Amino acid sequence: MQRLMLKSKIHRARVTEANLHYEGSLTIDETLMKAADILPYEQIKVYNVFNGARFDTYAIAGPAGSGVFCLNGAAARMGAAGDLIIIATYAQYDEAEIARHQPKVVLLDGDNRPLSQGLKACLS
């Protein structure tokens, strides 16, 4: 049996901008995408901590080290600069893979810099 499990998460990213007139997506600092094992154009789920909005879009890489998290297109209506968001990806795993699976989790500070990595960091 296959189960849908958390693959990766960027926790408490601060939205840096919203661009309603871009074609869509969420622009994410390329360094943070790599740390969280998120590929360009991969489907992502976004959870806005400030307003409760939850939506699906896809990731595009922004400049490495910039700390950018830009809501693009229709997603720009789901939040504003300064909002805290959680970005998650999911993948299907079989029972053998689940036994050894650990999601990639990147916890950010208020300036979108990594504080720590790993699920335990979010729980403490």
Curated annotation (Swiss-Prot):
Cofactor(s) annotated in UniProt: pyruvate
Cellular compartment(s): Cytoplasm
Pfam family, one: Asp_decarbox
Record field: catalytic activity: L-aspartate + H(+) = beta-alanine + CO2
Main location class: cytoplasm
Domain of life of the source: Bacteria
GO CC terms: cytosol
Cofactor binding mode and count: Binds 1 pyruvoyl group covalently per subunit.
PTM annotation (Pyruvic acid (Ser)): residues: 25
GO MF term (any one): aspartate 1-decarboxylase activity
E.C. numbers: 4.1.1.11
Active site per the UniProt annotation: 25, 58
Enzyme class, first EC level, given as a word: lyase
Protein's pathway: Cofactor biosynthesis; (R)-pantothenate biosynthesis; beta-alanine from L-aspartate: step 1/1
HAMAP family: PanD
Protein name per UniProt: Aspartate 1-decarboxylase
